[in-house]
């Protein structure tokens, strides 16, 4: 009897225990590297953006232009690098999932937190309409392209080229906006630290991509879902940190410009830049449905801000609820 128990333990329990230990080890390593990568992204992006603002103010750009172009490029650098690396590794689902998820996060969660941190403030209807329309147009183009299940180099070129075109459309709106004045510190100092910050972002993005691939394999979960929910939140941390800091300093135009500007980049440029060099397949059903939900939320957000011309805790709560509902709405579709 004892021999049978010993044989059972050796044949069944020991292998099961070893499998469990290997699973736990791989999961722990994957999660650890994901956290390290996201932390590196957040810290590096904050420094890169801080000194990018220094460069922009030295050039006497307006607050809205700083937020819409300069800061948004800086805070969106994780998504841009993630797009290139994931596409190069033939994991376009990570690229699209991260970009679409980032649009949802920035247009709902990030914008929704503004009035809870800095109180209610006014928004200019024409500014939010023009910026919002650009974001929605770019997103419509992206969603229509991913539904085919493949992003070609021509599709990617269109998405990348649309960003400077959309920025030109908004240029006239910001001509009369006052600049922030002179910045402290030397221009070369800000330039050097910005470059170092962006290098840190690139390293963090590579770590995140590798950890997502590993975790998806360990838990048998779609790379797209992990990217849409977890990675997108992580790569949106720079927007959250920078924008909430700007809100506390009453720099509302920088915060609004960055949140919407980052969404414009994510909706087109971010997806396109990786697939421009490395075209590839994407899981069309997932991308289409998640993209349509994020697009609907974007339209609701822009419409509410344009109609009310102010952003308070009522609209903030609505936007945060839209973000929370994404988890229920999207999982209910599959």
Task: List the predicted regions and their residue ranges.
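Hydrophobic alpha-helical segments, chiefly the membrane-spanning helices
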Residues: 1-334
């Amino acid at each position: 009897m004892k021999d049978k128990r010993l044989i059972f333990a050796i044949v069944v329990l020991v292998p099961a225990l070893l499998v469990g230990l290997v699973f736990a080890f791989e999961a722990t390593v994957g999660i650890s590297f994901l956290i390290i990568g996201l932390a590196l992204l957040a810290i590096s992006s904050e420094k890169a953006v801080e000194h990018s603002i220094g460069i922009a103010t030295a050039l006497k750009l307006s607050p809205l232009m700083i937020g819409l172009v300069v800061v948004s490029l800086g805070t969106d650098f994780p998504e841009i690098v993630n797009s290139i690396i994931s596409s190069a590794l033939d994991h376009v689902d990570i690229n699209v999932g991260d970009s679409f998820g980032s649009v949802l996060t920035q247009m709902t969660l990030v914008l929704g937190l503004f009035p809870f941190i800095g109180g209610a403030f006014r928004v200019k209807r024409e500014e939010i309409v023009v910026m919002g329309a650009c974001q929605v147009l770019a997103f419509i183009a992206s969603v229509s392209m991913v539904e085919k299940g493949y992003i070609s180099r021509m599709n990617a070129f269109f998405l990348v080229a649309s960003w400077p075109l959309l920025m030109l459309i908004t240029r006239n709106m910001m001509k009369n906006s006052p600049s922030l004045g002179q910045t402290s510190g030397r221009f070369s100092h800000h330039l050097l630290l910005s470059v170092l910050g962006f290098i840190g972002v690139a390293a963090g993005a590579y770590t995140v991509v590798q950890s997502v691939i590993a975790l998806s394999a360990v838990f048998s979960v779609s790379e797209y879902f992990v990217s849409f929910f977890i990675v997108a939140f992580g790569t949106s941390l720079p927007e959250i940190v920078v924008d909430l800091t700007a809100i506390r300093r009453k720099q509302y135009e920088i915060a609004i410009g960055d949140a919407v500007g980052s969404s414009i980049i994510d909706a087109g440029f971010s997806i396109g830049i990786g697939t421009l060099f490395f075209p590839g397949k994407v899981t069309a059903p997932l991308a289409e449905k998640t993209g349509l939900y994020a697009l609907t939320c974007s339209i609701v957000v822009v419409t509410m801000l344009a109609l009310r011309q102010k952003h308070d805790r009522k609209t903030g709560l609505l936007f945060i609820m839209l973000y929370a509902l994404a988890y229920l709405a999207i999982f209910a579709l599959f």
